[in-house]
Amino acid sequence: MSVTVKRIIDNTVIVPKLPANEDPVEYPADYFKKSKEIPLYINTTKSLSDLRGYVYQGLKSGNVSIIHVNSYLYGALKDIRGKLDKDWSSFGINIGKAGDTIGIFDLVSLKALDGVLPDGVSDASRTSADDKWLPLYLLGLYRVGRTQMPEYRKKLMDGLTNQCKMINEQFEPLVPEGRDIFDVWGNDSNYTKIVAAVDMFFHMFKKHECASFRYGTIVSRFKDCAALATFGHLCKITGMSTEDVTTWILNREVADEMAQMMLPGQEIDKADSYMPYLIDFGLSSKSPYSSVKNPAFHFWGQLTALLLRSTRARNARQPDDIEYTSLTTAGLLYAYAVGSSADLAQQFCVGDNKYTPDDNTGGLTTNAPPQGRDVVEWLGWFEDQNRKPTPDMMQYAKRAVMSLQGLREKTIGKYAKSEFDK
C-alpha cells in the first residue's frame, strides 16, 4: 500500500525520492542466461620462446606489456592437464565428463586478440626451465598488487620469492622492491580471466604438481564477496546452523541484504562453480555479495563476531552511512545470547548411561535471561527490558573489547572499542 505525503499548509501531495546513484547488483546466473561462454582474448602470433624473453626482460626493465604477459601465460600453461574423476558442470556449461582430460583454458573460450603486438626485448638465455617458475611469479604479482599496505605487501612478496625458490634455488626477484608496475594488471580483463581460470582449475585438481601456482590466484576466489564470508564466519563462531543464524536477523536492512545474497540459482554452495570467480571472469560488475552492497549485514555480522572474541573481526572495515544504533543493539543482543549460553549436550555414551535434561528450570525470576539460544525467547526477554541493553549486557560487551589494542581507524574493532569501553 502506497503512502501519501501531503504538505499541511495547502494539502499539496509530494512524492519523496532519492537519486539513483548506485548501479544495481549483477548475478552470475544472469550472465549465463545471455552467454554460454567466457571469452579470453589472446595474441598467439609469437612463439613461447620469444614471449618468455619479452616478459623476463620487461619485468627487469619495468616496461613489460600486459599483452606479452597474457600471451606468455597462455603459452606456458595451455598444456597443463588434469583427469576428471567426476562430471564437471556449472550454470548449464558442461566443462567435462568423468574420465576426460581437460586443461586450464577449457574453462574459457579462446579468441584472437586483434591489433599489433607491442615490441619486446628478446633474451636467448631464457629456456623452457623458466616455465616452471615464471608463471607462478607472474600470477603471484596479482596477489601482491591487490594490497597497498606496505608491511603486508612485503610479506606477500617474500612469500612469492620463497615459492619460486622452491622450484629454482637460483631465483631472484625480477621486480625491484618498491616498483609497482604490476599493480594495474588487475585492470586488464584478460589477465584476471587467466588468474580465475588457473585458480578454478587447481581448485578442482588440488594435488596437481603445479597447484602451487595458486599462491597468487587464490584471492580471485570469492573476490568482492566479503559479506558472504561474514555469514560463514558468523556461523562458525556461533556454532549455529545457517538457518538458526538467519533467525537472529532483527533489522530490516540486514534482512533485505540477506535476501539479496541468498537469491536462488546462483550456485553459492557449489564448490566447483564459476560463481566464486564472478568478478575476475567478468560475470558481474557489481557483486551481490560484497560488503559495499551489504553494509548493514556486514557490520552486524562482524560486530557480533567481535563481541564473541573473534580476532578476525577486529580489522573488518566499518561501513559508512548505516543505522548504527539499531544494528549495534541487535549485534549485542545476539552476542550476549550466544555468550551467555553453552550449546552443550552429551554426544556419546557407554551402554545406556545417558543424561536426561530436566525440563523444570525452576527458580528463575521473570528478569532472568533465557538459558538457550532461541531468538523468540530472547526477544520476549528483551521486550521485558524495554528493548534497551541491560547493565549486564553492556558489561559483557566491555569485557569483550577492553583488551583490544592497536586498532586501525574505520574498523569494527575501533568502533566497538569506542562504543563499549567507556
Curated annotation (Swiss-Prot):
<keyword id="KW-0694">RNA-binding</keyword>
<dbReference type="InterPro" id="IPR000448">
    <property type="entry name" value="Rhabdo_ncapsid"/>
</dbReference>
<keyword id="KW-0543">Viral nucleoprotein</keyword>
<dbReference type="GO" id="GO:1990904">
    <property type="term" value="C:ribonucleoprotein complex"/>
</dbReference>
<keyword id="KW-0167">Capsid protein</keyword>
<keyword id="KW-0687">Ribonucleoprotein</keyword>
<feature type="binding site">
    <location>
        <position position="152"/>
    </location>
    <ligand>
        <name>RNA</name>
    </ligand>
</feature>
<comment type="function">
    <text>Encapsidates the genome in a ratio of one N per nine ribonucleotides, protecting it from nucleases. The encapsidated genomic RNA is termed the NC and serves as template for transcription and replication. The nucleocapsid is bullet-shaped with the tip containing 8 turns of a conical spiral before reaching the helical cylindrical trunk. Nucleocapsid assembly is concomitant with replication, therefore viral replication depends on the intracellular concentration of free N, termed N(0). All replicative products are resistant to nucleases.</text>
</comment>
<dbReference type="GO" id="GO:0019029">
    <property type="term" value="C:helical viral capsid"/>
</dbReference>
<feature type="binding site">
    <location>
        <position position="214"/>
    </location>
    <ligand>
        <name>RNA</name>
    </ligand>
</feature>
<dbReference type="Pfam" id="PF00945">
    <property type="entry name" value="Rhabdo_ncap"/>
</dbReference>
<comment type="subunit">
    <text>Homomultimerizes to form the nucleocapsid. Binds to viral genomic RNA; this interaction contributes to the virion assembly. N in the nucleocapsid interacts (via C-terminus) with the P protein (via C-terminus); this interaction allows to package the L polymerase in the virion and positions the polymerase on the template, since P acts as a bridge between N and L. N(0) interacts with the P protein; this interaction prevents the uncontrolled aggregation of N(0). Interacts with the matrix protein (inner layer); this interaction contributes to the virion assembly. Interacts with the L polymerase.</text>
</comment>
<dbReference type="InterPro" id="IPR035961">
    <property type="entry name" value="Rhabdovirus_nucleoprotein-like"/>
</dbReference>
<keyword id="KW-0946">Virion</keyword>
<dbReference type="InterPro" id="IPR023331">
    <property type="entry name" value="Rhabdovirus_ncapsid_C"/>
</dbReference>
<feature type="binding site">
    <location>
        <position position="317"/>
    </location>
    <ligand>
        <name>RNA</name>
    </ligand>
</feature>
<dbReference type="GO" id="GO:0030430">
    <property type="term" value="C:host cell cytoplasm"/>
</dbReference>
<feature type="region of interest" description="Interaction with the phosphoprotein">
    <location>
        <begin position="350"/>
        <end position="390"/>
    </location>
</feature>
<dbReference type="GO" id="GO:0003723">
    <property type="term" value="F:RNA binding"/>
</dbReference>
<keyword id="KW-1035">Host cytoplasm</keyword>
<keyword id="KW-1139">Helical capsid protein</keyword>
<feature type="binding site">
    <location>
        <position position="408"/>
    </location>
    <ligand>
        <name>RNA</name>
    </ligand>
</feature>
<dbReference type="InterPro" id="IPR023330">
    <property type="entry name" value="Rhabdovirus_ncapsid_N"/>
</dbReference>
<protein>
    <recommendedName>
        <fullName>Nucleoprotein</fullName>
    </recommendedName>
</protein>
<dbReference type="GO" id="GO:0019013">
    <property type="term" value="C:viral nucleocapsid"/>
</dbReference>
<feature type="binding site">
    <location>
        <position position="286"/>
    </location>
    <ligand>
        <name>RNA</name>
    </ligand>
</feature>
<feature type="binding site">
    <location>
        <position position="143"/>
    </location>
    <ligand>
        <name>RNA</name>
    </ligand>
</feature>
<comment type="similarity">
    <text>Belongs to the vesiculovirus nucleocapsid protein family.</text>
</comment>
<feature type="binding site">
    <location>
        <position position="206"/>
    </location>
    <ligand>
        <name>RNA</name>
    </ligand>
</feature>
